[in-house]
Amino acid sequence: QTYAHKALTGRAYTYIDPERYGEASGFANPDESEHDLFAMGHTSTSVSLGCGLAHARDLAGDAYNVITIIGDGSLSGGLAFEGFNNAAELDSNLIIIVNDNDQSIAENHGGLYRNLAELRASNGTCERNVFRAMGLDYRYLDAGNDVLALVDALQELRDIDHPIVLHVSTAKGKGFEPAQSDPERWHHVGPFDMATGRKLCPGHPSEPAPRTYADITGEALSAAIERDPQVVGITAATPYIMGFTPELRAAAGKQFVDVGIAEEHAVTFATALARSGAKPVFGVYGTFLQRAYDELWHDLCLNDAPATILVFGASIFGTTSETHLSFFDISMLGGLPNMHYLAPACMEEYLSMLSWSLDHREHPVAIRVPGIGLVSRPDLAPAEDTDYSAVRYNVVRQGRDVAVLALGDFFELGERVANRLAAEYGIEATLVNPRYATELDREFLDSLAAEHRV
């Protein structure tokens, strides 16, 4: 939806000119264009923003249209319901377009979507209507991909004097057969072969895409689910970041739960599972975990529930939009009681921490999943019985005078720094893998300070 808006407001170049790919950010950004009213990229916000715009218009005595668009997948977010509920209180123009393609990022989940299916099947005439139940007027358009039909519908509604939902049925990926036949895989893609649809390795177009932390997460959790009926994987509409393909989700059955775009519910759901003896693992992008801060504090950590949270994408790489950056995760989780936040430096360490967290029954555990590509370092592999409940930094290389502490994704950079100090300056630095993002090994740090100058 944002891409079409950007193309129509002077930024088509970012999609059609190879020399200018990436110049525009992935989401709405007022710094790019006066036509972008808000910086936004997290879902379910549009109806609440529309309510605010409409109320401000009315306070100023103006009479323009306010039109807001929300996808059916975004309806699973709690903020969407808050917006619809308050929109019904307006007594002036507000047009809410619900773009319903019967798909979130993966498939939709939740009872709401049964009613949307009934509305589509009845051409909008079904007596049960969630939008009318919230006090909103309603229109249905079956031909949502027909531009002229959509224009006619909007012309009909443009002067309406009260809030109304225009429910349009569309096809995700319309016009590109591979995307229509596999909408989940094509929701977000990198380079691919146009003829075959095969994903390509950036910089090496003839090679298949490399394995990722998502792949090994899916493999490890699937094996754990098969061994232990108490292990439960949880996602908030992004199962692919945990490596859970449709096949793995089907095999897991009730041991894998997609709650929709509802991070708050996911955290509180995991809290109750953990307190009831289950072993929940919630995989989530760091940028979206921010939405559940109160639940992290009030539900998970205050109750000291031994759930595992896998935090993906926690850094500043891999995006051109500040809405999807995630560099507040350490400060956010570091202020919570009872929480262990681990930061592995490689695949071996990550799998060790994940395995330990499944059987750890004392406190909540979060793991900062590396994001710079799958790194295998057998030399850093922890012992099988490593207990991460006691904060102990790992000295990878003992040196003198200078100490380099390199956490998680920064470990290889720290290692290169230590190697360069040795090669160019003859300084044998101590190289440390801290492993804990928010807890200090105070005894070790005191000894380090006593024995090193820098």
What are these regions (language model features)?
Residues 1-90, 231, 245-246:
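Cofactor-binding active-site loop characterized by glycine-rich and histidine/acidic residues
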Residues 101-217:
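Long, well-ordered, tryptophan-enriched scaffold segments
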Residues 8, 176-290, 295-305, 384-392, ...:
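Non-catalytic terminal/interface segments that mediate subunit docking, oligomerization
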Residues 152-154, 187, 212-226, 243-250, ...:
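Glycine-/acidic-rich phosphate or pyrophosphate-binding loops and their flanking alpha/beta elements
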Residues 39, 62-77, 94-97, 232-234, ...:
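A short, small-residue-rich loop immediately preceding and capping a beta-strand
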